[in-house]
């Protein structure tokens, strides 16, 4: 998909770049697969900010995605490819032969009219979903489960994929795009192919307002705050942070400091993404 640039009629248009998506459905989404969403502004039930830089944005409805793909041995036809405002990937509307419809993450190369199916012994074909134990080693997959029948959790964003590199006993070894090597149970499902809309990272919003449409608020530097608001705040003019190392607003070291504490899943990571 090519990029489109605009005439420089304003600073925002001069910098903007959009991805051309001619095959995306231009009409309304399927009504029965929509749910309402309410904005939180990053606040919890006490009204306190728990996630910073969230607020505003266009009103959106959630598209219910079938991440489990547990409707086995029933063929489905791709009715159309749609835009989803809640994720970077596009979604595909499926129509099963029994009349049921559902949304899935659209793989790269999937198009209207294609036939796909889920099950333990289905063909190795783009869009088909089956357990890792039945997928040939070396195959590129996406929408991978971390626990059997829990639903896809890995490789769901635009352009992402995972490669099946080995199988040993009840485990399958996956190579992530980050370079991490990870083991998951071979009973976990995955979908053949990689996620579409791979040029999403090439787009340029062009102006701050476009980011606000997405519900993202500005990020203020700690050094620009007062001492009451941030450990880096205060001082005369543009003074330094005053700490031996940069910290978060809560005093935790940042910029390279490792904070991952999850011994329960560490045993499944064969090689980390940093080598």
Curated annotation (Swiss-Prot):
InterPro entries according to UniProt: NA-bd_OB-fold (IPR012340), Rib_uL2_dom2 (IPR014722), Ribosomal_uL2 (IPR002171), Ribosomal_uL2_bac/org-type (IPR005880), Ribosomal_uL2_C (IPR022669), Ribosomal_uL2_CS (IPR022671), Ribosomal_uL2_dom3 (IPR014726), Ribosomal_uL2_RNA-bd_dom (IPR022666)
Keyword Ribonucleoprotein: yes
GO annotation terms (biological process): cytoplasmic translation
HAMAP family attached to this UniProt entry: Ribosomal_uL2_B
RNA-binding listed as a keyword: yes
Protein name: Large ribosomal subunit protein uL2
Gene3D superfamilies noted in UniProt: 2.30.30.30, Nucleic acid-binding proteins, Ribosomal protein L2, domain 3
Stored PANTHER family: LARGE RIBOSOMAL SUBUNIT PROTEIN UL2M, RIBOSOMAL PROTEIN L2
Cellular compartments per GO CC: large ribosomal subunit
Residues annotated as transmembrane: none
Molecular functions (GO terms): rRNA binding; structural constituent of ribosome; transferase activity
SUBUNIT field: Part of the 50S ribosomal subunit. Forms a bridge to the 30S subunit in the 70S ribosome.
């Amino acid at each position: 998909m090519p990029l489109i640039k605009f005439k420089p009629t304003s600073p925002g248009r001069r910098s903007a770049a959009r991805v051309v998506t001619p095959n995306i459905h231009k009409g309304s989404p399927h009504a029965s697969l929509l749910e309402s969403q309410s904005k939180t502004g990053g606040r919890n039930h006490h009204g306190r900010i728990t996630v910073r830089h969230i607020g505003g944005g266009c009103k959106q409805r959630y598209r219910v995605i079938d991440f489990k793909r547990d409707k086995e041995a029933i063929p489905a036809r791709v009715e159309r490819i749609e835009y989803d405002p809640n994720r970077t990937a596009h979604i595909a509307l499926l129509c099963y032969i029994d009349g049921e419809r559902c949304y899935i993450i659209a793989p790269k190369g999937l198009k209207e009219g294609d036939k796909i199916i889920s099950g333990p012994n289905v063909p190795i074909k783009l869009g088909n979903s089956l357990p890792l134990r039945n997928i040939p080693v070396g195959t590129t997959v996406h929408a991978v489960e971390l626990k059997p029948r829990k639903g896809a959790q890995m490789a769901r964003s635009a352009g992402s994929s995972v490669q099946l590199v080995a199988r040993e006993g009840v485990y399958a070894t996956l190579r992530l795009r980050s370079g991490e090597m990870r083991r998951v149970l071979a009973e976990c499902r995955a979908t053949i192919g990689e996620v579409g809309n791979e040029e999403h990272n090439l787009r340029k919003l062009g102006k701050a307002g476009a980011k606000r449409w997405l519900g993202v608020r500005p990020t203020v530097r700690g050094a620009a705050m007062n001492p009451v608001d941030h450990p880096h705040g205060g001082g005369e003019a543009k003074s330094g942070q005053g700490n031996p190392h940069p910290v978060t607003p809560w005093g935790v070291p940042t910029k390279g400091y490792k904070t991952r504490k999850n011994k329960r899943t560490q045993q499944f990571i064969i090689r980390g993404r940093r080598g």
